[in-house]
Amino acid sequence: MPIILGYWNIRGLAHSIRLLLEYTDSSYEEKKYMMGDAPDYDRSQWLNEKFKLGLDFPNLPYLIDGTHKITQSNAILRYIARKHNLCGETEKEKIQEDILENQLMDNRMQLARLCYNPDFEKLKPEYLEGLPEMLKLYSQFLGKQPWFLGDKITFVDFIAYDVLERNQVFEPSCLDAFPNLKDFISRFEGLEKISAYMKSSRFLPRPVFTKMAVWGNK
């Protein structure tokens, strides 16, 4: 039976999961839930199923793989990564992996909070002002390595790609001062399975957020 990935019909938190499923050549199907238009943003497609799937903590995204039913995007990523040996191996790598995973989630949520805020236009300059400092830390961490933990790709590279690339969509010039981050994105997109997925009809780079967002809702 194929894996089932459930999420809104957007990029959102599922982007790195979809990329990891594709990279690992996993057999999966998507259950994409539609959200209604303003002002109600009807979520009944999801709410009608929310408590019928046997999820311990019902939420989107969810992944069902046989008897394994998982919510929380990073828990889903770690589950797939463990199956395919895409986690850090040494204690140092595991520590770096944990730090990166959480740091990336913090920065992902920073952008999301801004883009859902009614005062988006007022707050945007402050976000852009802090963006170079944020990206500089990732650039320093990556250094001359091909991947964030070294020579081996791991699941945190999939999160990093998503976070860095969506910031590039938000502010196209933001990576210009960080050639190693631009190279990282090119390297990731050049992976055979990823490149094929990006050319397929399954690829969903937009909308970044739901219809409730001020930016990234289309």
UniProtKB/Swiss-Prot annotation:
BP GO annotations: glutathione metabolic process; hepoxilin biosynthetic process
Residue sites binding glutathione per the record: 7-8, 43-46, 50, 59-60, 72-73
GST C-terminal domain: residues covered: 90-208
CDD domains named among the record's database cross-references: GST_C_Mu, GST_N_Mu
Keywords associated with the record: Cytoplasm, Lipid metabolism, Phosphoprotein, Transferase
Listed PROSITE patterns: GST_CTER, GST_NTER
EC number: 2.5.1.18
Catalyzed reaction equations: RX + glutathione = an S-substituted glutathione + a halide anion + H(+); 11(S)-hydroxy-14(S),15(S)-epoxy-(5Z,8Z,12E)-eicosatrienoate + glutathione = (11S,15S)-dihydroxy-14(R)-S-glutathionyl-(5Z,8Z,12E)-eicosatrienoate
Site, as annotated: Important for substrate specificity: 210
All copies of domain GST N-terminal, residue ranges: 2-88
Residue positions where Phosphoserine is found in the record: 27, 44
Single Gene Ontology MF annotation: glutathione transferase activity
Family: Belongs to the GST superfamily. Mu family.
Subunit structure as annotated in this protein's UniProt entry: Homodimer.
Chain's role: Conjugation of reduced glutathione to a wide number of exogenous and endogenous hydrophobic electrophiles. Participates in the formation of novel hepoxilin regioisomers.
Protein's name in the database: Glutathione S-transferase Mu 2
